[in-house]
């Protein structure tokens, strides 16, 4: 069953009528609803085009958080072969919010790091709603070190509202873990491609997104804080999240114009949740192209390019 966002009501109403007509035709074969269903399907497509061609930043935030949007595990199943996840940080514990391991990508050995939110109550609790603890970032560091040692390109898929802010996480060095992970991303002498597939929240996202090439899906978001968090800090009113989202420049178009990301991956009509297979395939093509472009570069050049990219970003924004 499709989950509709509040601004998708016209689409919901039309698709609801289509479902009713199909049910009616099933119950009474003498009734021909083919033509009416065809007309309604055309209207659905027109409604989707009309709505999704002018999404505001807050609506894009809602799409980025859509519960049926493909998550890391969906990309991993399709994009990677022989994915072997590694567990634990060898210091304290395992954190399922970050999935990391070794795999093959179109025949090429790679290291993979991603944030997983989960898709139902049980899995969301297991993955801590995609908010990593220090152990997750230290696990990512393990994978980055391994990739650097064996010359494996790194692919990271970002989807988090932010790092977990709990007391225990702070006591175990959350800030240090994020900083070390970011430092490691900047230091490896292998290609590093990052894609924001949903939410890219604050340091919790950038800790695995400091890549040579950084991309965003068309309806994903990337920001220093969530719109609700920004509204709470700026105006002491989280209900002004829509206003905050507009002012924060969090959309893929905004960040491309600012030079924060290198490219935007188009989503299917109506968002990635309406056609996960096509957006996953498109993401794979972009990653493959980026890796091919970087293949001739030396490890030293890759590292220097990455560092200069982010230093320039800090100077120019």
UniProtKB/Swiss-Prot annotation:
GO terms for molecular function: acetyl-CoA carboxylase activity; ATP binding; carboxyl- or carbamoyltransferase activity. Residues 40-293 form the CoA carboxyltransferase C-terminal domain. It is found in: Cytoplasm. The keyword ATP-binding applies. It catalyses: N(6)-carboxybiotinyl-L-lysyl-[protein] + acetyl-CoA = N(6)-biotinyl-L-lysyl-[protein] + malonyl-CoA. Its EC number is 2.1.3.15. HAMAP family: AcetylCoA_CT_alpha. This is Acetyl-coenzyme A carboxylase carboxyl transferase subunit alpha. The gene is accA.
């Amino acid at each position: 069953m499709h989950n509709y966002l509040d601004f998708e009501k016209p689409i919901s109403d039309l698709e609801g009528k289509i479902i009713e007509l199909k049910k009616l035709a099933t119950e009474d074969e003498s009734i021909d609803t083919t033509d009416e269903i065809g007309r309604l399907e055309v209207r659905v497509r027109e409604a989707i085009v009309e709505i999704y061609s002018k999404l505001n930043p807050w609506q894009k935030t809602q799409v980025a958080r859509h519960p049926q949007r493909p998550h890391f595990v969906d990309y991993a199943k399709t994009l990677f072969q022989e994915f072997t996840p590694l567990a634990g940080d060898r210091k304290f514990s395992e954190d399922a919010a970050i999935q990391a391991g070794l795999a093959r990508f179109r025949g090429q050995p790679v290291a993979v790091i991603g944030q997983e939110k989960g898709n139902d109550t049980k899995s969301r609790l297991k993955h801590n709603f995609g908010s990593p603890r220090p152990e997750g970032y230290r696990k990512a560091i393990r994978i980055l070190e391994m990739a650097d040692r064996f010359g494996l390109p790194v692919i990271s898929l970002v989807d988090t509202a932010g790092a977990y802010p709990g007391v225990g996480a702070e006591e175990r060095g959350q800030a240090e873990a994020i900083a070390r992970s970011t430092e490691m991303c900047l230091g490896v002498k292998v290609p590093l491609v990052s894609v924001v597939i949903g939410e890219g929240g604050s340091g919790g996202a950038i800790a695995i997104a400091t890549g040579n090439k950084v991309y965003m899906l068309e309806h994903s978001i990337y920001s220093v804080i969530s719109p609700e968090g920004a509204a709470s800090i700026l105006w002491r009113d989280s209900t002004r999240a829509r206003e905050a989202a507009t002012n924060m420049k969090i959309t893929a178009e905004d960040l491309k114009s600012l030079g924060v990301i290198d490219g935007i991956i188009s989503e299917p009509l109506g968002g990635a949740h309406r056609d996960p297979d096509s957006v996953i395939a498109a993401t794979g093509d972009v990653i493959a192209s980026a890796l091919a472009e970087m293949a001739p570069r030396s490890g030293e050049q890759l590292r220097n390019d990455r560092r200069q990219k982010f230093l320039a970003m800090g100077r120019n924004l």
